[in-house]
């Protein structure tokens, strides 16, 4: 499994090296880029409403999800009596949903930037609704389906909020904004 993972990363790196396009905006010189500080990133976030909301969405998601993941083990051991298999199925369901969600939302709601960004709110609600139903689930398999569906929303929220930050921030400050984005979550 490690070898497959390694080879996939090497292949990805090879594909990146094949890109011949300059992907930078080239607005600022190198010396001006070096002057961008953490405070500049924070000021940019606070001054732009869209960036502010995109930046805090993962943090709010993290606060609302705090502790839920440890409940998979409790559900598996105490409620469903399925041990490691149950916990593994629940964790796998999250991953499947997080993978399917952004692709499905993009297909269903459109490919334009505005349409993708407008799905962030509904995707959070979808995540919340399906997670709310988990305590009422009679079996591990129903819980697994609820987790897949819930994480379709959670995955879309995560992917599209990151995408929004990438397309709405200038090159010279994007790293600071991304750093703030993830610091609010972790």
Across the structure, where does each feature detected by a protein language model lie?
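Low-complexity, compositionally biased segments
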Residues: 8, 23-25, 43, 87, ...
């Amino acid at each position: 499994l490690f070898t497959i993972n390694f080879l996939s990363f090497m292949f990805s790196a090879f594909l990146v090296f094949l890109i011949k396009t300059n992907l930078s905006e080239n607005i600022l010189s190198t010396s001006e880029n070096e002057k961008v500080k953490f405070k500049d990133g924070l000021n940019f976030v606070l001054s732009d409403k869209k960036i502010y909301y995109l930046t805090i969405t993962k943090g709010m998601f993290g606060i609302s999800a705090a502790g839920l993941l440890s409940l998979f083990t409790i559900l598996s051991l105490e409620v469903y009596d399925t041990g490691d298999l149950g916990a593994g199925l629940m964790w796998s369901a999250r991953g499947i949903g997080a993978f399917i969600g952004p692709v499905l939302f993009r297909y269903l709601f459109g490919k334009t930037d505005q349409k993708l960004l407008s799905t962030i709110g509904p995707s959070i609600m979808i995540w919340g609704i399906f997670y709310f139903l988990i305590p009422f689930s009679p079996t591990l398999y129903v819980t697994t389906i609820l987790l897949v569906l819930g994480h379709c929303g959670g995955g879309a929220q995560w992917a599209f909020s990151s995408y929004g930050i990438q397309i709405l921030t200038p090159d010279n400050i994007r790293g600071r904004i991304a750093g703030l984005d993830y610091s609010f979550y972790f």
